Swiss-Prot record:
Belongs to the SAICAR synthetase family. Pfam families: SAICAR_synt. This is Phosphoribosylaminoimidazole-succinocarboxamide synthase. GO terms for molecular function: ATP binding; phosphoribosylaminoimidazolesuccinocarboxamide synthase activity. Its EC number is 6.3.2.6. It catalyses: 5-amino-1-(5-phospho-D-ribosyl)imidazole-4-carboxylate + L-aspartate + ATP = (2S)-2-[5-amino-1-(5-phospho-beta-D-ribosyl)imidazole-4-carboxamido]succinate + ADP + phosphate + 2 H(+). The lineage of its organism: Bacteria, Bacillati, Chloroflexota, Chloroflexia, Chloroflexales. Pathway: Purine metabolism; IMP biosynthesis via de novo pathway; 5-amino-1-(5-phospho-D-ribosyl)imidazole-4-carboxamide from 5-amino-1-(5-phospho-D-ribosyl)imidazole-4-carboxylate: step 1/2. Coiled coil: none annotated.
Length: 249
């Protein structure tokens, strides 16, 4: 596929301008996987295609549900065409189950505690500062988003969480938490952007942590071996296959 100029490159993707349409961009999914703000990095052959397939399935489902996203099409497993937008430097996290960083920051909360409604947190995208948590008031004060936009980020992220939670629940899988990002399109409207793949959530089949299917398996490895990376690849393949059902109903 023809590509325009490279706009940016991260640990798991490259973003290019679209060669024929200035309102679009092209995302190429890479085979990289990382943890600890990039302190741990590896290559898993085929991961880019699996992550791209999962992301395309998720965004297709969200688009069909009427959620405003940047997703246009996925002509190839590693390629995604999106509406070009200016990213908001925030990670928006909804949590149904207390686990991961939440219980490290809140040791008084037992792992497995259920939040109803889902608990909302914002984190500033800043690898050098390890993506610090940021309050809605600080988001507004720093000019990252307006108060109205913060409310929209909260409501839309919860809507996305509930849609994905329902899709996983149909397969007896618990969505523990979900991290998404937003951008502003050419009109200034907020849209769900970036990617939503197996790096974006924690999912526990049957609600059992020991059966987790997500990136946490990679994070938890004391030593990363070739066999371990193959185990992770198989999990990403299973998740991509499971999300195929979301668009083939």
């Amino acid at each position: 596929m023809n590509l325009g100029e490279k706009l940016t490159e991260g640990k798991t993707k490259i973003v290019y301008a679209h060669p024929n349409d200035p309102t679009l961009a092209i995302i190429i999914h890479k085979d990289g996987i990382s943890a600890g703000d990039g302190a741990r990095r590896h290559i898993i052959p085929g991961k880019g295609a699996l992550s791209g397939r999962t992301t395309a399935n998720v965004f297709t489902m969200l688009n069909h549900a009427g959620v405003a996203t940047h997703f246009v099409a996925a002509p190839e497993p590693t390629v995604m065409i999106v509406r070009r937008c200016v990213m908001i430097p925030l990670e928006v996290v909804n949590r149904r189950i207390a686990t991961g960083s939440y219980i490290r920051r809140h040791p008084d909360v037992a792992e497995g505690t259920r939040f109803d409604p889902p608990l909302l947190e914002f984190f500033l995208k800043d690898d050098a500062r390890h993506d610090p948590q940021i309050s809605p008031e600080e988001i507004v004060a720093q000019g990252i988003a307006s108060a109205d936009e913060v409310e929209q980020l909260a409501s839309e992220s919860r809507r996305v969480f509930l849609l994905i939670e329902e899709a996983w629940a149909a397969q007896d899988i618990v969505l523990c938490d979900l991290k998404i990002e937003f951008g502003r399109d050419a009109s200034g409207a907020l849209v769900v952007a970036d990617v939503i793949d197996n790096d974006s959530w924690r999912i526990w089949p049957g609600g059992m942590k020991e059966r987790m299917l997500d990136k946490q398996v990679y994070r938890n490895m004391p030593v990363v071996t070739d066999d371990g990376l193959e185990q992770v690849r198989r999990l990403y393949e299973e998740v991509a296959h499971r999300t195929d059902a979301w668009v083939n109903r």
